[in-house]
UniProtKB/Swiss-Prot annotation:
Residues at which D-glucose 6-phosphate binds: K177, H207, Y208, L209, G210, K211, E245, D264, K367, K372, Q403
Top-level taxonomy: Eukaryota, Metazoa, Ecdysozoa, Nematoda, Chromadorea
Residues annotated for NADP(+) 1 binding in this entry: G40, A41, S42, G43, D44, L45, A46, K47, R74, K177
UniProt-annotated binding residues for NADP(+) 2: R364, K373, R377, R401, Y409, M410, K411, D429, L430, T431, R495, W517
GO terms for MF: glucose-6-phosphate dehydrogenase activity; NADP binding
Keyword Transferase: no
EC id: 1.1.1.49
Organism per entry: Caenorhabditis elegans
UniProt keyword annotations, A-Z: Carbohydrate metabolism, Cytoplasm, Glucose metabolism, NADP, Oxidoreductase
GO BP terms: glucose 6-phosphate metabolic process; glucose metabolic process; NADP metabolic process; pentose-phosphate shunt, oxidative branch
Record's protein name: Glucose-6-phosphate 1-dehydrogenase
Amino acid sequence: MACKRHSVSDPISKDLVECLRESMQRDLKFETPYVFVIFGASGDLAKKKIYPTLWWLFRDNLLPVNIKFIGYARSDLTVFKLRESFEKNCKVRENEKCAFDDFIKKCSYVQGQYDTSEGFQRLQSSIDDFQKESNNQAVNRLYYLALPPSVFNVVSTELKKNCMDHGDSWTRVIIEKPFGHDLKSSCELSTHLAKLFKEDQIYRIDHYLGKEMVQNLMVMRFGNRILAPSWNRDHIASVMISFKEDFGTGGRAGYFDTAGIIRDVMQNHLMQILTLVAMEKPASLNAEDIRDEKVKVLKAAKVVELKDVVVGQYIASPEFDHPEASQGYKDDKSVPADSTTPTYALAVVHINNERWEGVPFFLRCGKALNEKKAEVRIQFKEVSGDIYPSGELKRSELVMRVQPNEAVYMKLMTKKPGMGFGVEETELDLTYNNRFKEVRLPDAYERLFLEVFMGSQINFVRTDELEYAWRILTPVLEELKKKKVQPVQYKFGSRGPTEGDELMKKYGFIFTGTYKWVAPKL
């Protein structure tokens, strides 16, 4: 029987709630009035993630007592209709229904356009009314822009004009990716935002930075002396950062075709993880010290060249047992027949500094692959002066599995049990659901929302981080488009194009295929 996995909808234990509240007291005044405004309240992100996350935090008493949630969108909605749209995703238990009703009482809705002032003025009136209800205490404001990039500029401009605090409270703006389409558009967006808000008011959210195992990267690196001496080019052969999905584009093909997997996943999620793997130890756990070190990594990274990239596009595989497998990417009616948008990409990043020179970083991501997982795989070099028969020793690997089944394990060689002296691969395994059975790991959005409330920007993307990340990938994106590079076809449910494996082999990655980690059973 597999060990029980705690759902993100499970309540956090009372002891942990008290501990969290105590640690938050320094940065969060629980009695002060707050408004959390969701722009794009009728959209999928709001229904599937934002409202459910706010409910879980509210249920667990981790939000300020005096808070109001305001949805804003163009749709003609009531609070009742809004509730219907997200309630099933909140997974409310029978004994939580009264608390959920209290949560809904704190929700309201403002209908308005994004490109005119009238709706924003109504929003400000709603905030003013809330302030009057709160004995005229100044209201802290959090604005979540769960919107397409096409309206970022106009919405942020109207916000600045109509809905800012008056200096006796604070305003924070949360921006959802994509943060631009390339280096130029990203810089234009950043320049626009800089005219309206200070850097400490802007929270560019990359939910991968809130995941438990991504958070664990810094602790693993800088909290364990045993790893520090080997974390460099003398001992590490390569680093592979993977993001694999076992489903296709589904209903997102129209949007996805304008972006592609490099913009959708590699430029943000994978590049952020790369910086955490490669950065030097920061001077402190202060947000700016950490982000300074991440920027140094991005500055040292070379621009990715076309010869170091493989792009692919999935095709139908009717024989594969999956409801989407009978349809390839271009079989979707919303995708142009001549689309060259990649659904798979592998890029090799080279970091030109003393620690990492000569160590390839493989960024690999794709849809419709053979499994769903995200992981960081550190492959170490061979043992010097090998005394065992040729080929018996395999490279050791440290693997941090981000999702699913969060785990850290070290693949290494041990003696085969018995009378002989043969060796075999095994692992030292820390599977979170096995080791921490009673702990419910927080959802990434829960963690990040709390950090915005507390004013912590450790896990949010700074302007210069964004610029240097785009600098690395924009030239190859432009070259792929200019040369109309045809993606390599791969079957739905496969490992992806074999050309990707060949490119990794070219740079020294060794895939033996003799060992596979299996999530432990109880």
